[in-house]
């Protein structure tokens, strides 16, 4: 989808209301391609490690009759993957029709995709991390001869299609409006081979064979998600000499049907193919209204304010979630001030109050509460012809933050739970340095302290006060560099490096939950050959990831359980962890032909 966008804007902290319902950590605003005045076509293809093949075809009719333009894209990616059998087959499409005149812009978009990926969410143990990094237990079973086999269709198979219609209108020099309607259709399943599952799990009745009671069976199941998401968003913008005022809102509704099917079973006397052994329905509604104002107080001082109301409703009746009928009403105010000291220096301060509802997985893990956040941010920006610097200090104080526990549910999704009080305090710095006409340097660093306050944990049957613990998956240090050499417009070489510090996969500061720090360095080269013919240009590219072949583990999971059966009368808390290793050095080379 990124190849069909003209810009991606990442806003840190609590997202502005104009970008949607709002966010806690960051919000991403994606703007699809603008219309093209001239017709074009391009064909791209890349090949790389692990039998990776990526193909992309993109076109535009150009502006026809000064008003109409049609554009589109078809793409396909296939790969065997680094992990055993972790193959992927991804297809995507994008179609856009545009109408424009002096004051009107209408865009109709239809895009979507289909993915088939072999499951690989089980991870590996610490011992396997040392001796068998690519091992994948998904699909593994033992046949009647006692031999290990792998089920070939242990896959995630999902399709999604999006339709959007956008209408932008400029009414006069002061007013413009935007109205959009959208609909998303999703459907798909993941398929699993299961050994010796209990009949009771699937509503099957035990039976007797030759005097022996049969209560388990090998089977193949599919767990489906069939969903619809639709709604509208709208806004009106007023501009005057010193004031920009935006008023808007939206209404969205999601309907999801989660159900399971048995498509084969070794023993299933009272079951038919594709019998549903569970069928859960859920509905989520989301309505929001906001007003945002930016006011230029003086040549140096400007103010902004943003108030939003959100109403969220949940209805669910599943075995995993239980009976849910919750309604949340949130008021989210934001305010800030900016001071332009001179043409080089700019300072800002902002405050935001945000509330966020739990998601469906959170209901599967208990009775969650909504999160509440107070976000304070202070920043300085410096701009000169050869040096740009951005610094930001933030303090985010939470009540009932839904933090990752480190555990996974039975479909590989991460679990979260509420903690009472917590905070995230940090400093972010990024810069853009022009070292010479050909060399540029873009460093960045993020330092943070992320804590659960007065965290309690039950170990060996006793509740313990662990004090202030690190929040899971929150490294204290992240740093990056991009060094680029570009002697002319046709040739560019970049060296990219990233450091991620030590982090815990759980919230109890257990050494068994540690993900070690790592550094990854990548190399990128691009060369453009300009042509004076039917072919306008040929772009060649090469990418080497992890050029130093480092053993990197960027993610994993951590869990605990109480053992009360090994030694009757006592409770022992057992810890465990799984890891997702990343590939060593790998390559991707490609070419794009522009017509």
Protein language model features and the residues they cover:
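Transmembrane beta-barrel wall of Gram-negative outer-membrane proteins
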Residues: 40, 47-78, 83-120, 166-172
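Short acidic/polar hinge/loop motifs at secondary-structure boundaries
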Residues: 1-12, 31, 367
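C-terminal beta-barrel architecture of Gram-negative outer-membrane proteins
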Residues: 79-80, 473-532, 548, 556-557
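Structural signature of Gram-negative outer-membrane beta-barrels, strongest in the C-terminal barrel
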Residues: 102, 252, 277-398, 434-436, ...
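Gram-negative outer-membrane beta-barrel transporters
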Residues: 299, 395, 417-507, 594
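C-terminal beta-signal and adjacent terminal beta-strands/loops
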Residues: 399, 441, 449-451, 499-504, ...
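Acidic/polar loop-and-plug regions of large Gram-negative outer-membrane beta-barrel proteins
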Residues: 98, 105-164, 191-219
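Membrane-embedded beta-barrel scaffold of Gram-negative outer-membrane proteins
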Residues: 170, 174-182, 340, 346-352, ...
């Amino acid at each position: 989808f990124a190849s069909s966008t003209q810009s991606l804007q990442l806003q840190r902290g609590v997202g502005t209301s104009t970008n949607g319902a709002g966010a806690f950590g960051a919000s991403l605003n994606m703007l699809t391609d603008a219309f093209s005045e001239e017709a074009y076509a391009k064909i791209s293809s890349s090949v790389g490690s692990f039998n990776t093949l990526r193909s992309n075809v993109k076109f535009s009719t150009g502006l026809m009759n000064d008003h109409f333009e049609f554009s589109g894209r078809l793409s396909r990616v296939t790969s065997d993957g680094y992990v055993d059998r972790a193959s992927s087959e991804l297809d995507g499409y994008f179609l856009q029709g545009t109408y424009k005149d002096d004051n009107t812009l209408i865009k109709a978009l239809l895009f979507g995709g289909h993915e088939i990926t072999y499951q690989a969410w089980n991870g590996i143990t610490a011992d396997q991390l040392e001796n068998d990094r690519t091992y994948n237990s998904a699909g593994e079973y033992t046949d009647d001869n006692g031999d290990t086999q792998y089920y070939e269709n242990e896959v995630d198979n999902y399709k999604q299609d999006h339709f959007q219609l956008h209408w932008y209108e400029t009414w006069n020099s002061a007013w413009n409006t935007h109205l959009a309607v959208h609909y998303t259709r999703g459907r798909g399943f993941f398929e699993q081979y299961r050994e010796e599952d209990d009949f009771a799990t699937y509503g099957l009745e035990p039976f007797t064979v030759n005097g022996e009671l049969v209560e388990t069976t090998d089977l193949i199941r599919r767990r489906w998600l069939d969903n619809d998401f639709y709604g509208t968003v709208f806004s009106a913008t007023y501009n005057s000499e010193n004031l920009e005022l935006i008023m808007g809102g939206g209404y969205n509704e999601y309907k999801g049907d989660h159900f399971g099917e048995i498509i084969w079973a070794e023993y299933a006397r009272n079951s038919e193919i594709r019998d549903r052994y569970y069928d859960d329905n859920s509905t989520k509604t989301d309505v929001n209204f906001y007003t945002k104002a930016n006011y230029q107080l003086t040549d140096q001082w400007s103010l902004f304010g943003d108030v939003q109301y959100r109403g969220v409703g949940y209805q669910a009746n599943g075995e995993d979630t239980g009976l849910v009928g919750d309604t949340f009403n949130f008021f989210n105010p934001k305010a800030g001030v900016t001071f332009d000291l001179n043409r080089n220096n700019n300072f800002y301060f902002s405050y935001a109050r945000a509330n966020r509802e739990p998601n469906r997985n959170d209901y599967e893990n208990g009775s969650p509460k909504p999160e509440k956040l107070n976000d304070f941010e202070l920043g300085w920006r410096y701009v000169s012809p050869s040096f740009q610097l951005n610094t930001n200090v933030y303090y985010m104080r939470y009540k009932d933050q839904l933090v990752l526990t480190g555990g996974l549910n039975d479909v590989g999704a991460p679990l979260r739970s509420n903690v009472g009080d917590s905070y995230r305090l940090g400093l972010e710095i990024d810069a853009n340095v022009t070292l010479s006409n050909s060399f540029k340097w873009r460093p960045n660093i993020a330092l943070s302290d992320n804590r659960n306050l007065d965290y309690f944990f039950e170990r060996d049957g006793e509740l313990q006060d662990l004090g202030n613990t690190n929040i899971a998956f929150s490294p204290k240090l992240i740093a990056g560099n991009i060094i680029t050499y570009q002697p002319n417009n046709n040739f560019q070489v970049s060296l990219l490096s990233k450091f991620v510090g030590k982090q815990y996969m759980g919230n109890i500061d257990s050494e068994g939950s540690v993900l070690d720090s790592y550094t990854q360095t990548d190399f990128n080269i691009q060369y453009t050959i300009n042509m004076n013919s039917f072919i306008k240009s040929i772009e060649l590219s090469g990418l080497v990831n992890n050029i130093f072949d480092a053993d990197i583990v960027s993610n994993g999971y951590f869990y605990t359980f109480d053992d009360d059966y090994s030694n009757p009368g006592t409770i022992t808390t057992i810890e465990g962890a799984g890891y997702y290793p990343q590939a060593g050095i790998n390559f991707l080379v490609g070419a794009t032909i522009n017509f």
